[in-house]
Amino acid sequence: MTEVARYTQLILPVFWLGMVVAISFLEAPIKFRALGVTLAIGLGIGRKVFFALNAVELVLALALLASCVAAPPGATALTVLALVTVVLVVQVAVVRPPLGTRSDRILAGENLPRSRMHLVYIGLEAAKVALLIALIFQLFRAVASCLP
């Protein structure tokens, strides 16, 4: 069980980081530049994609937590995992609801200025990327210390 937990600690944060970078920093901005993608279409796609991304992220965070219970990686790694999870929860529970309301209004035909909450979400995504990189290093260090 401990060996599976350690492999989980190596694989899941790298997968999580790849998903966030690919979706938040590649797919999201590029889709609005695609020919024929209107703001309404882009918002509709974005809502679905980010709902799915955040759902998978929550599962990954829980799976990583479970692996850390099975094979504790040390206080620093646990702290970084907690911080990444807090950032995710803030995004889902605090920032996304007003963004959803705003996109509903835009889809209903209102012409609204850019939202600061969108910038907050992007800032949290950048923080999450930095924390995931730190988590990867901490977990790799913890797993390496268990090797013969």
PLM feature segments, named:
Residues 70-105:
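Mid-chain, well-packed structural core segment of small domains
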Residues 101-119:
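Acidic interhelical loop/turn segments
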Residues 8-22, 56-66, 79, 83-90, ...:
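Lipid-exposed faces of alpha-helical membrane segments in multi-pass integral membrane proteins
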Residues 133-148:
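Juxtamembrane boundary at the C-terminal end of a transmembrane helix
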Residues 45-47, 57-82, 139-142:
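Charged, compositionally biased, marginally structured helical/coil segments
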Residues 2-64, 106-111, 146-148:
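Interfacial loop at the N-terminal end of multi-pass membrane proteins
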Residues 49-52, 113-131:
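Individual transmembrane alpha-helices with interfacial aromatic-anchor signatures
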